[in-house]
């Protein structure tokens, strides 16, 4: 798939901007702070309904405005689709598909698919588990759009259950509290099992591609791997740190999750119900849910050591890039069975890499149907990514500068 046209109204720094795009490589060049990333962020938001830079929608609206509009014309498998996303302050966002009546924003998920590489990706290795959970859930929503509803259902149940635990913690725990918790345990077990099952399947798809991508980028002897750490297996401590096979924070092996990978959603549901019962006393004492996919982690491993805390800066960057490439390869596999190859976005990434990693990454992505790259100067772009150049200037695009 590829974008033919992007239009933004009151998005970030832009009152109005239009960008004509084409298949192949397009490099947007402009000094730092000029607005290149805002353009890439808008495309990424259209694909995932979330920003790679901020956790809330407020900063996406141009200061002093009440809504922002992102419009795009997308060509997918030869068919043209016009997407429009209205981002509103204080109320639900809305979408339109081919100028239809308004639909829920999440109805747009899965239509425009992107893989976005950015400096913020360092948080995938160095950050807390929420960054890695978000990575998995966003990729799942792109591949299977109804996963967004699954995650939303789980978050809703989790919020209700936590409110009940806090209420019970504030006073004496009564039989009514216990009975109500039993009901919410069932709801959360079912929603959590669906979420966990989907994540486990996705991690198994990612693992071989992660190893391949890391080897392509580095020629390193250390193999790269990813291990899903679940609270169902006592793989996380009460503060959210990963536990290895020894029960101490640290790496383990993928076999530790073998029994979970072989379980059905119904079996996982029963596992959660039992786990909630075993942890109830501690949860009532703390007033929060200690078991569930909201506390799980995706541990990234280099050789025998976790990448977090042990990888060098260069290895950390290689792992981040490899994880994004792995998601790209998974999407390509999906495209071969009826999907469509995603748009690749590389936002100010090459400036962060040494020459060797620049050239290897460029060689890998150059064959994608559409590659959008941003850079402060042309010198940051490897020769392997020859293509159209677009000059970004204050407030818009310099058509004469292309």
Curated annotation (Swiss-Prot):
Cell location: Cytoplasm
What PROSITE patterns does the annotation carry? RECF_1, RECF_2
Would you say which domain of life the source belongs to?
Bacteria
Its Gene Ontology cellular component terms are:
cytoplasm
Instruction: Give each disulfide bond as a residue pair.
Output: none
* GO molecular function list: ATP binding; ATP hydrolysis activity; single-stranded DNA binding
Q: Which residues are involved in binding ATP?
A: 30-37
Q: InterPro entries from the xrefs? A: AAA+_ATPase (IPR003593), DNA-binding_RecF (IPR001238), DNA-binding_RecF_CS (IPR018078), P-loop_NTPase (IPR027417), RecF/RecN/SMC_N (IPR003395), RecF_2 (IPR042174)
Q: One matching Pfam family, short form?
A: SMC_N
Family, according to the entry, reads as follows: Belongs to the RecF family.
Q: Which PANTHER family match?
A: DNA REPLICATION AND REPAIR PROTEIN RECF
| Protein name, as recorded | DNA replication and repair protein RecF
Q: Which organism is it from?
A: Pseudarthrobacter chlorophenolicus (strain ATCC 700700 / DSM 12829 / CIP 107037 / JCM 12360 / KCTC 9906 / NCIMB 13794 / A6) (Arthrobacter chlorophenolicus)
Give the taxonomic lineage as stored in the record: Bacteria, Bacillati, Actinomycetota, Actinomycetes, Micrococcales
Q: Gene encoding this chain?
A: recF
